[in-house]
UniProtKB/Swiss-Prot annotation:
Belongs to the IPP isomerase type 2 family. It holds the Pfam family FMN_dh. Substrate binds at R6, K7, S94, Q95, R96, Q158. CDD domains: IDI-2_FMN (cd02811). This is Isopentenyl-diphosphate delta-isomerase. Homooctamer. Dimer of tetramers. The keyword Flavoprotein applies. The gene is fni. It comes from Metallosphaera sedula (strain ATCC 51363 / DSM 5348 / JCM 9185 / NBRC 15509 / TH2). It catalyses: isopentenyl diphosphate = dimethylallyl diphosphate. It is found in: Cytoplasm. Its EC number is 5.3.3.2. It is an enzyme of class 5 (isomerase). The lineage of its organism: Archaea, Thermoproteota, Thermoprotei, Sulfolobales, Sulfolobaceae.
């Protein structure tokens, strides 16, 4: 299957097949403490956040998922237009197809035309570095959308179970990426792809100079499950194995804590199963700087601009409600808001040797 057709199939599967992770985000184990006297009016809540030198109206970005085909360009155009109007940030899907097939670049370029002032994030995969991508290919992707940053995605699990996968992740690839990053004119964001980020990985990335991290944890779209569907359709021998591993990964809530704990000065994007404004609030209170959404945005975007705007407006209200009811006047205050960690998340963190009292001071200092 061509890379272009694979992109279309991925989106079709995300829209019409059940590929949500069988493991939760564990955000349900985070309880924000209600304050019966918020000490402010609801209209006083300030949801603005800083990202890539720009101010967002909400601590929220659309993380990369689509591009590489004319039909996907239409979806990107809708998302970009709404992002521009509402003051959000946006990442595009992997641009490998456009770097190698420039005739497909329009499906990505449309984002900058529709969002002239929004922070836009380009996207390439680390396996491409292993296969020879260098500064030129990275600059091609950045210039394609006049990006404010470029995300480099880590997806070893997806690559492993993909029929055409390239599970090539030697340490030399990260070292090469570090060298490439020094020649770029925008920051590099390193992101996972739905299976989460451990404290070991976060520390390794930070040691190589990467401190803007998208944890993309388990609990949202499972890209192993996406490849499981593709394996089933093709009768591929990897089907049963991909089914077995469809719940593999680190839940989003645990990924946030592990990353903040191991790299206290990192800038964390919390994505993976973020579905509403309360999820955004919990993610930030746990230690993230902003949150990211992909799958729910895709589902609303294919139904049109107004449907997507309505969705984001509802998310904004839910976030503001959580901030008001915790007495959090702004996003920084929300990061200091009292919370209770219980259940499986507490068990996870304790078994990983994370002292909650120590983490409490780390998250408040972020």
């Amino acid at each position: 299957m061509s890379l272009i057709n694979r992109k279309l199939e991925h989106v079709e599967i995300c829209l019409y097949e059940d590929v949500q992770g069988i493991v939760s985000t564990l955000l349900e184990d985070v309880t924000l403490i209600h304050q019966a006297m918020p000490r402010m009016n609801f209209r006083d809540v300030d949801t603005r956040a800083e990202f890539l030198g720009k101010t967002l109206s909400l601590p929220l970005m659309v993380t990369g998922m689509t591009g590489g085909h004319e039909e996907l360009g239409k979806v990107n155009a809708v998302i970009a237009e709404v992002v521009e109007e509402l003051g959000l940030a946006m990442g595009v899907g992997s641009q490998r197809v456009a770097v190698e097939r420039p005739e497909t670049a329009e499906s990505f370029k449309v984002t900058r035309r529709m969002a002239p002032t929004a922070p836009l994030v380009a996207n390439l995969g680390l396996p491409q570095v292993t296969r020879g991508y260098g500064v030129k290919q990275f600059m091609d992707a950045i210039q394609m959308i006049e990006a404010n940053a470029i995300a480099v995605h880590l997806n070893p699990a997806q690559e492993l179970f993909q029929p055409e996968g390239e599970p090539e992740y030697p340490l030399s690839a990260l070292e090469a990426l570090r060298d490439i990053s020094k020649e770029l004119n925008v920051p590099v964001i390193v992101k996972e792809s739905g299976t989460g980020m451990s404290m070991e990985t976060a520390k390794l990335l930070a040691d190589h100079g990467f401190k803007i991290l998208d944890v993309s944890g388990q609990g949202g779209t499972s890209w192993i499950a996406v490849e499981m569907v593709r394996n089933r359709r093709k009768g591929n021998w990897k089907y049963e194995s991909s089914q077995l591993f469809s719940g593999w990964g680190i839940p989003t809530a645990a990924s946030i804590v592990e990353t903040r704990y191991s790299v206290p000065d990192s800038y964390i994007i919390a994505s993976g199963g973020i579905r509403n404004g309360l999820d955004v609030a919990k993610s930030i209170s746990l230690g993230a700087n902003i949150a990211g959404m992909a799958n729910p945005v895709l589902h609303h975007a294919v139904r049109g601009k107004e449907q997507l705007k309505k969705f984001f407006e509802e998310v904004a209200f839910q976030l503001r409600a959580a901030m008001f009811l915790t007495g959090s006047r702004d996003v920084k205050t929300l990061r200091h808001a009292p919370l209770v960690i219980s259940g499986k998340l507490k068990d996870w963190l304790e078994s990983r040797g994370l002292t909650l009292s120590v983490y409490e001071s780390i998250r408040k200092g972020a």
